[in-house]
């Protein structure tokens, strides 16, 4: 495909138009600004169609930024980005896309666009984010391998999310691969490049085994240290739980744990001996009540409310759950006429907004009332 083949308002993917991507390339807007504008106007197309006065007075943009949108800035760069991504087999997903991960969508500082290489469905599996020090000890590696292995044995559709860095990240990804679980790497580099370069082979193994590599960075991004900090928020938001396997008194994994806590995620930590410097951080998280103590995979399963395979039995529901909210009852009622429904069908059936539906679906999954199937369809349990 050449640039001339791409037009404005064209759906470059089923749920995404060129305008979604173009907002990223407007100087002074970026991902955070794009999220704000789309939330305000309803869609990226509506942002570009908005009059200058609305952009300034209603959305609060500076006049020069409004002018860039009115002039169609970012469109040509977006066209080139589509060509680049198709050349490298990279999927582009906007925050309004049905394939955008539900836990990430509820974060206020979510990326407006994700670039995904590999299996997009991996982002919607039963995910656990695992982080820790880059100087992981042999004991920390063994613990990571044991916990991930036991989880993979006990839980269907397990996906381990981590950051592709040295140390605990690499140990988590490799443990998932060794035990037949899916794993997703979130990188602070422009795809298809992998940092560190020593983990390129690991990335290939992840992709070969049904996982994915994720970045929020378009191909024109200039590398800088702040990108790694920003990457951590994606790791924290992608899962309902975050496990810190080993950390010294300071470090990036503790920052990620803080971010996860701010998102309302379940933060967990593995304790270590009081003389082990690589456990000072995790021990302190537990001591201060900022993380739940993890001694086994069973603790993780219990803290996240997961149901292990051994306890999964067909059940006949006699009465409706009294804890269901009215929107949740509407969602479940929609399955009376169809065995499976996708995101758009549920919006049509319930009249809920995208944000409302995302939150209610997550609650219903946690309650065990519905489950997500391959292909982004839901079924009632």
Identify the role of each PLM range.
Residues 3, 9-16, 86, 94-381:
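Glycine-biased, small-residue-rich flexible motifs in mid-sequence functional cores and linkers
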Residues 5-99, 285, 367-369, 374-381:
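Short, small/acidic-rich helices and loops at N termini and domain boundaries
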């Amino acid at each position: 495909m050449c640039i001339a083949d791409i037009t404005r308002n064209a759906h470059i993917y089923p749920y995404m138009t060129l305008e979604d991507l173009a907002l990223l390339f407007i100087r002074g807007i970026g991902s955070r600004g794009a999220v704000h504008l789309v939330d305000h106007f309803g869609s990226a197309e509506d942002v570009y169609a908005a009059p200058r006065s609305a952009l300034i007075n209603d959305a609060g943009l500076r006049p020069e930024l409004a002018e860039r949108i009115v002039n169609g800035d970012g469109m040509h760069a977006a066209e080139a980005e589509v060509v680049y991504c198709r050349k490298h087999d990279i999927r582009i997903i906007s925050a309004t896309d049905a394939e955008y991960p539900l836990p990430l969508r509820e974060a206020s500082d979510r990326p407006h666009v994700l670039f995904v290489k590999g299996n997009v469905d991996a982002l919607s599996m039963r995910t656990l984010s695992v982080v820790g020090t880059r100087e992981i000890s042999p004991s920390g590696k063994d613990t990571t391998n044991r916990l991930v292995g036991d989880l993979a044995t006990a839980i269907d559709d397990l996906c381990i999310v981590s950051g592709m860095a040295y140390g605990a990240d690499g140990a988590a990804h490799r443990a998932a691969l060794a035990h037949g679980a899916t794993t997703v790497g979130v990188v602070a580099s422009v795809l298809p490049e992998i940092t560190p370069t020593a983990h390129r082979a690991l990335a290939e193994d992840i992709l070969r085994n049904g996982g994915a590599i994720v970045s929020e960075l378009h191909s024109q991004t200039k590398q800088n240290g702040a990108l790694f900090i920003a990457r951590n928020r994606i790791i924290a938001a992608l899962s309902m739980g975050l496990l810190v396997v080993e950390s010294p008194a300071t470090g990036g994994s503790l920052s990620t744990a803080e971010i996860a806590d701010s998102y309302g995620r379940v933060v967990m930590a593995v304790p270590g001996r009081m003389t082990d410097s690589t456990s000072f951080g995790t021990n302190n998280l537990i001591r201060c009540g900022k993380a739940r103590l993890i001694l086994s995979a069973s603790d993780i399963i219990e803290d996240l409310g997961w149901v292990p395979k051994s306890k999964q039995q067909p059940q006949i529901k006699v009465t409706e759950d009294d804890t269901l909210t009215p929107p949740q009852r509407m969602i479940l009622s929609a399955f009376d006429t169809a065995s499976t429904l996708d995101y758009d069908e549920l919006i049509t059936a319930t009249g809920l907004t995208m944000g409302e539906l995302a939150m209610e679906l997550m609650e219903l999954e946690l309650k065990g009332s519905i489950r997500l199937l391959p292909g982004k369809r839901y079924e009632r349990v």
